[in-house]
Amino acid sequence: MMGRDHALSGALVFAALATTLHVNDAHLAAGVALCAGAGVLPDIDHQDTSISSSFGFLTEGFSRLVALLSGGHRHGTHSIFGIAVFTVGSYFAGAYQLSGPKVTGIGHPAFSWHLVPAVLLMSLLYSAALRALHVGGHHGDLLGIGGALLTCYTGADLTRLPVGSWHVPMLAIAVALGCAAHIAGDELTHGGCPIFWPASMHEFHLLPRPLQFTTAKLCETWIVFPLLVVGLGLAVWHDAGHPLVLPSSPGQHAASGP
């Protein structure tokens, strides 16, 4: 699939699950944007993609390294193993709430080196989403950095959302959902994905061959893209009609005191 449609699919998945995740409106906006960026994250294994060109030679060099380690495009990063690596990395990047300092009485994080991994990752995701959607032009990188800093200030990336009996940083959830949406999208195409890499290189598909489509051809342009736009619009409309309540994590209860 094209980067634009990968970004839309990531945004759609987070918006569709927003009421289940119990996020408020501010966190919904951040989550949708982060998940849109994560929707193109697996393509960091290819140099000619929106995410690989987000920050010039820095991301291009990193892309070459990822491609070398993962076996090339649509291999390691397009597998269950790849989703796990991205998710674990983003979990630790977003988990600085556990030890990062707070501004007394405000609840926003004070400046700390704990912020750096999350700021870097969110800058990459925001910038990649903007590039994939052809928004922001040459200023997409600066907008991505600004968005990451704003997200940190509002504490959106600090939010721990309930997943079963766990409370997981929203950044990790957005990355996991976005990567999963990306792989599912590629499994609709003729190329498929080796989801059990490195144990197996067999390419899996979600549709029978007659229903599979080719990237950037008529089916994706005139059917898949409009469906994603309509689906995202309906999901956001649905979220707007339902109160989105952000639950407090056990740590937040303890910090608030009696």
Regions found by a protein language model. Name each.
Residues 1-258:
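N-terminal membrane-targeting hydrophobic helices
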